[in-house]
Amino acid sequence: MVNRDRLAETFKFLAEIDSVSKEERAISREIKKILESMGAKIWVDGAGDKIGGDTGNLIAKFKGSRKAPPLLLNAHMDTVEPGKGVTAVLSDGVFTSDGTTILGADDKSAIAIILETIKIIRENDLAYGPLELVFTVCEEIGLLGAKHLDLDLITAKLGYSLDATDTEGIVTRAPSANHLEFKVHGKDAHAGAAPEKGINAISLASRAIAGLELGRIDHETTCNIGIIEGGTATNIVPNLVTVKGEVRSHDEEKLNKITHAMVSSFKGVVDNYKGMSSDHGLPGLETKIQKDFSRTSIPEDHPVVKLACRAADNLGRKLVTKTSGGGADANIFFEKGIMTGVLGTGMRDMHTVRESVGLDDMVRATELLLEIIRLHTLD
């Protein structure tokens, strides 16, 4: 029933539209045209204005032909860099870029799958219940679209986000994440003529970082320092450095413990030096902690999981529940009371120029989504 050629054409069309974070207007317009041609009612919310983007989240609703609880389907429209000027190449059944950019299968493979699913339903006059499609902006830079989604437009209480790799899995657990920013203030001085008059902010930050346990802490907790910015010239003792990092965990107690350890390491180094310094108030430390997203944990006996597993069974497949180390729009929907499982599209090596997605995987994902909608309508 899936039109492979059409699915491939749709994905290639979408992949080659520039849509890096905060610049999703062009792809949103094209998705809107396709959905309107199939009879959808469309809204664009005000998320773009709130986050400094050129458009908001795109919400499309289909009334359905049968009475059933509304079902949410989600994908995000933005991509990471390098994501401009993409050429999508299909070879031996696998899409890649030309090697100079990402492909954008994350998450345009999901958009193509959702659009193909709706086309199949409409052209075959299949029974279906109300559908609420949510195509978000700025997922890649902090789930910002989902965080600013106009919930007055959403009535669904369960749904599926297509933003994982494995087409034979459903992600039911994802971690909480804290974002941390440290600004270490030192004192500038000439590095050659009078280095002893300076306080090297980079050196202090380095000591604090050296005292941290980074990488995989345990099976459900990670810690990372990802950005260090500071210094103006090699002959100047740097008076400021900014360090940014994150902690993720499926356990809130562990999340808070590692977050506290990071803060303590920086504070300890700065306070220790300050105790030996004759410069009033220096060195100094500014600390910011922001909750990026909260963990999700959907029980295996929840209807959103059971429905997807039944659909897979009907197709002669077995869907396995999975745990993710990353965040997705589903984390935010979960916070807002919408139980959202995350399904795979087959995408691989996301966020790299080696990114790929197999057409067979996209077909399998479409078949699963069709069966989920069919069963949901019957239930």
What do these predicted ranges mean?
Residues M1-R25, K291, M350-T352:
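N-terminal capping segment at the start of a domain
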Residues G48, M77-T79, V134-G142, A164-D166, ...:
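Acidic, glycine-rich active-site loops and adjacent beta-strand->loop/helix elements
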Residues D78-G93, V171-K183, C309-R310, G341:
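Acidic-glycine-rich active-site phosphate/pyrophosphate-binding loop
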Residues L90-I102, H185-A189, L315-G316, M347-H351:
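Glycine/charged-rich beta-loop-alpha catalytic/anionic-binding loops adjacent to active sites
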Residues I202-D379:
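Metal-dependent amide/peptide-bond hydrolase catalytic core
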